[in-house]
């Protein structure tokens, strides 16, 4: 008797040659979290792409927490439906800030991946990182930020103070286009 697989077969969006890509949408989601963000996202990339297409989005931005884990599946599924994937992630810093981070080119994509790897491999004090933990501070983010569009996210509680304490209160980030 053959063994049944322990995991179900992965679902995919079936390509359709008659499919017309959505027109330019006035609004698209940029901070979508997939099921690859443990205890945060519940939706499989297939479901997110199907929902984006159904809502008429011409693009969708994936932003898993300190991870690029969902981007490959989102990219493949989105292309099948004519939805442009905006590839990035949500960077959460040790200072308590969160940024949507979207690389502008291949080199910036590499820097973003190296930033995440650095945060996952070594703690800020130089010791090896515990599994599943990612420590990225603003200085580390600034060192890898060239060519990456960063959007600072407000706190969940808008009554919270939206500032951080820093030694000099200034963390230099590279300017766009300069």
Residue ranges and their predicted role:
Residues 1-178:
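Phosphodiester-processing cores and adjacent nucleic acid-binding clamps
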């Amino acid at each position: 008797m053959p063994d049944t697989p322990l995991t179900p077969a992965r679902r995919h969006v079936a390509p359709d040659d008659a499919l017309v890509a959505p027109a330019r949408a006035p609004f698209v989601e940029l901070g979508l979290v997939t099921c690859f963000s443990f205890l945060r996202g519940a939706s499989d990339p297939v479901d997110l792409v199907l929902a984006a297409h159904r809502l008429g989005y011409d693009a969708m931005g994936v932003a898993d927490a300190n991870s690029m884990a969902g981007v490959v599946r989102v990219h493949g599924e989105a292309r099948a439906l004519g939805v442009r994937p905006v590839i990035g992630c949500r960077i959460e810093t040790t200072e308590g800030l969160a940024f949507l981070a979207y690389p502008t080119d291949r080199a910036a994509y590499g820097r973003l991946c190296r930033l995440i790897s650095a945060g996952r491999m070594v703690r800020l004090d130089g010791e090896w990182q515990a599994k599943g933990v990612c420590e990225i501070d603003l200085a580390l983010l600034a060192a890898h930020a060239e060519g990456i569009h960063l959007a600072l996210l407000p706190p969940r509680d808008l009554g919270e103070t939206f500032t951080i304490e820093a030694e000099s209160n200034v963390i230099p980030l590279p300017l766009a286009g300069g």
